[in-house]
């Protein structure tokens, strides 16, 4: 059975403390036992579940809400102090409780108590319960105190470890920062050196670039003359053509043969020599040379035809009749 003891003050005797004990099996809503004492006398009553339901119906309240209001009024620590008012009459042995709302109050319940014949026994049980409760609370308090001390020691230990971790972290960060600064300075130095080397290479390329362009552009007039001049094959073609023309002229313009009786072998050898003149490969002549040859070609052909006719007449004149029939 669970019980709760509280100290209350009656509205009729505000300076006299009374002690109210409420005990129940399962819950207050299933019924409870109420005991009231002033230290000399004791009164008690048993409230059933049916009576609780009737009180809730009389007040037009839900049963659950009514039970909550009873718990707040009878069990200490459940409601606000000074909100509820207790009334008791020793003559009528009627006990009632009311709830105050500003200027208005309404009755929560009323019970008819019976005076206990052996009040000392009731008071003794009440005192024993209070002492047991105090002892239990003290033991619980001591246990909580020890637990609090243990947690405090653990907290101090954790705090010490945490401070060590923070110190180690700060030292590690400082060391890593110093190493980072060293590496960063090395990288900066290397980048500066590479940048300087790159600038030197670019300046060297810019200085050597005009020197590379000058040999191609600064050619002497003699070199241009060499490139403008004709090759050996081109210059040799007019020379060979002139020699060929000169040889042809010499053949056609040579004096007539004065031998009156040439032998057959000489004539054949001469004709053979004339017919076996080496042939020259045609070569392309310059434009001016072609024009000169074209202008002189008719005159040359005319002279060649005249020379051929004279030579044929002279040959016929000097030849003998025997040669003609040979």
Swiss-Prot record:
Q: Which GO terms describe its cellular component?
A: chromosome, telomeric region; cytoplasm; DNA-dependent protein kinase-DNA ligase 4 complex; ERCC4-ERCC1 complex; nonhomologous end joining complex; site of double-strand break
Result of altering residue 53 to A: In 9A mutant; abolished phosphorylation by PRKDC; does not affect ability to repair double-strand breaks (DSBs), possibly because of redundancy with NHEJ1/XLF phosphorylation sites
Q: Name one GO molecular function term.
A: DNA binding
Please cite one Gene Ontology biological process associated with this protein.
Answer: negative regulation of neuron apoptotic process
Q: Where is the composition biased (Polar residues)?
A: 307-326
Q: Which residues form a coiled coil?
A: 131-165, 185-209
Region listing for Interaction with LIG4, in residue ranges = 180-211
What are the Phosphothreonine sites (modified residues) in this protein? Answer: 231, 244, 315
Taxonomically, the superkingdom here is Eukaryota
Q: Which UniProt keywords apply?
A: Chromosome, Coiled coil, Cytoplasm, DNA damage, DNA recombination, DNA repair, DNA-binding, Isopeptide bond, Nucleus, Phosphoprotein, Ubl conjugation
User: In which broad location class does this protein mainly occur, judging by the first location in its UniProt entry?
Assistant: nucleus
**Stretches the record annotates as Disordered:** 203-326
What does the UniProt PTM comment say about this protein? Phosphorylated by PRKDC at the C-terminus in response to DNA damage; Ser-254 and Ser-312 constitute the main phosphorylation sites. Phosphorylation by PRKDC at the C-terminus of XRCC4 and NHEJ1/XLF are highly redundant and regulate ability of the XRCC4-NHEJ1/XLF subcomplex to bridge DNA. Phosphorylation by PRKDC does not prevent interaction with NHEJ1/XLF but disrupts ability to bridge DNA and promotes detachment from DNA. Phosphorylation at Ser-319 and Ser-320 by PRKDC promotes recognition by the SCF(FBXW7) complex and subsequent ubiquitination via 'Lys-63'-linked ubiquitin.
Segments of this protein annotated with the region Interaction with IFFO1? 1-212
**Known outcome of mutating residue 312 to A:** In 9A mutant; abolished phosphorylation by PRKDC; does not affect ability to repair double-strand breaks (DSBs), possibly because of redundancy with NHEJ1/XLF phosphorylation sites
* Post-translational modification Phosphotyrosine, affected residues: 227
Query: Where is the protein found, in the record's own terms?
Result: Nucleus; Chromosome
Record-stated family? Belongs to the XRCC4-XLF family. XRCC4 subfamily.
UniProt protein name: DNA repair protein XRCC4
Give the species.
Mus musculus (Mouse)
């Amino acid at each position: 059975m669970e019980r709760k003891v509280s100290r209350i003050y009656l509205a009729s005797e505000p300076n006299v403390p009374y002690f109210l004990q409420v005990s129940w099996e399962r819950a207050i809503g299933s019924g409870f036992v109420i005991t009231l004492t002033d230290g000399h006398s004791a009164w008690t009553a048993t409230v059933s579940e049916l009576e609780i339901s009737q009180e809730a119906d009389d007040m037009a309240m839900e049963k659950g809400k009514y039970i909550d209001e009873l718990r707040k009024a009878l069990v200490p620590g459940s409601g606000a102090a000074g909100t509820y008012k207790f009334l008791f009459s020793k003559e009528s042995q009627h006990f009632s409780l009311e709830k105050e709302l500003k200027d208005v109050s309404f009755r929560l319940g009323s019970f008819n108590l019976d005076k206990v014949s052996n009040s000392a026994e009731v008071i003794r049980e009440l005192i024993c319960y209070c002492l047991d409760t105090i002892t239990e609370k003290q033991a619980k308090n001591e246990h909580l105190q020890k637990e609090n001390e243990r947690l405090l020691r653990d907290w101090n230990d954790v705090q010490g470890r945490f401070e060590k971790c923070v110190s180690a972290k700060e030292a590690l960060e400082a060391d890593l920062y110093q190493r980072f600064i060293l590496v960063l300075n090395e990288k900066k130095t290397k980048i500066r050196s590479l940048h300087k080397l790159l600038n030197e290479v670019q300046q060297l390329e810019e200085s050597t670039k005009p020197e590379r362009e000058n040999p191609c552009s600064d050619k002497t007039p003699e070199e241009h003359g060499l490139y403008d001049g004709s090759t050996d094959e081109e210059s040799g073609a007019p020379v060979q053509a002139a020699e060929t023309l000169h040889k042809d002229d010499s053949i056609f313009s040579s004096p007539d043969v004065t031998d009156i009786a040439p032998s057959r072998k000489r004539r054949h050898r001469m004709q053979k020599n004339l017919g076996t003149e080496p042939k020259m490969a045609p070569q392309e002549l310059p434009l001016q040379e072609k024009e000169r040859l074209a202008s002189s070609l008719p005159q040359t052909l005319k002279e060649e035809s005249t020379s051929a006719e004279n030579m044929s007449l002279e040959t016929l004149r000097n030849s003998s009749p025997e040669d003609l029939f040979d």
